[in-house]
Amino acid sequence: MCAARLAAAAAQSVYAFSARPLAGGEPVSLGSLRGKVLLIENVASLUGTTVRDYTQMNELQRRLGPRGLVVLGFPCNQFGHQENAKNEEILNSLKYVRPGGGFEPNFMLFEKCEVNGAGAHPLFAFLREALPAPSDDATALMTDPKLIAWSPVCRNDVAWNFEKFLVGPDGVPVRRYSRRFQTIDIEPDIEALLSQGPSSA
């Protein structure tokens, strides 16, 4: 069993994990976000839904951040090589290419990582174990098996860019959404979690 899966198996919440910010610096412990509702997405700057999803992530962070939502984006190049820029190039790609027009994410972006396979970030190994399939499309699979560029392949793998994981204020994953489910449409589920108030976990 790889280290990522061992870490995922031992974890009880996302608070066991950390990730390095895209801008550099020390890793951010997700434990520092205790009591917040988290929306975690694997992102890519050259995907067909980049403009839609990035702008909707910004909108949710703008509207619901003051009430306790934290949006987290994890660039990943495992799906159609649609995040092939280096870490230091991603923000400029977003600003000038897609979405473009001076776009700047107002949410936390982390360094590129893998979300599937033996090299998967431990956070994503945990999320996939906790929520094996998207709630809106339990049969979601990668549409073209020739594009699978990781091993081992598991039934609970992330199928494409912009899958979403909603995590409650106790750090426990609540719901997973497919790439087809628009980010902005998660708002009612986020509102429901925010209305529960912060957890003491």
Curated annotation (Swiss-Prot):
Protein location: Cytoplasm; Mitochondrion
Keywords from the named record: Acetylation, Cytoplasm, Lipid metabolism, Mitochondrion, Oxidoreductase, Peroxidase, Phosphoprotein, Selenocysteine
Annotated catalytic residues: 47
Residues with PTM N6-succinyllysine: 86, 112, 146
CDD domains the UniProt entry points to: GSH_Peroxidase (cd00340)
Phosphoserine PTM positions: 32, 195, 199
UniProt main location, coarse: cytoplasm
Pfam family, one: GSHPx
Protein known as: Glutathione peroxidase 1
Gene that produces this protein: GPX1
